[in-house]
Amino acid sequence: MGHPEYSVLMSVYAKERPEWLRESVRSMLVQTVPPSEFVLVEDGPLTDGLYGAIEDFESERPGLFKIVSYPENKGLGHALREGVSACTKPVIARMDSDDLARPDRMKV
């Protein structure tokens, strides 16, 4: 039996630390059951460091990331509502950009 496909949903805004974002995203990319899609909501303009981290991940995993961008910060609630709408898989794994997931978090 195959594993169900799932989306990772994460929001990021300008006050986040790029190194935390990198660690958080990586912790989901190395899951025993890897994500089928990664929806990242840019809640307002970001720092160069955050944009750089996101660009690196898009280069490393072409086609995995779906970026939803807003020109101004609208808050976590709005970002997540819009992010859920952008997810296309039957299961959504919610992550904050400063969370770390155990490698077996998505184990079925």
Each predicted region: which residue ranges?
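Nucleotide-sugar donor-binding/catalytic module of glycosyltransferases
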Residues: M1-V108
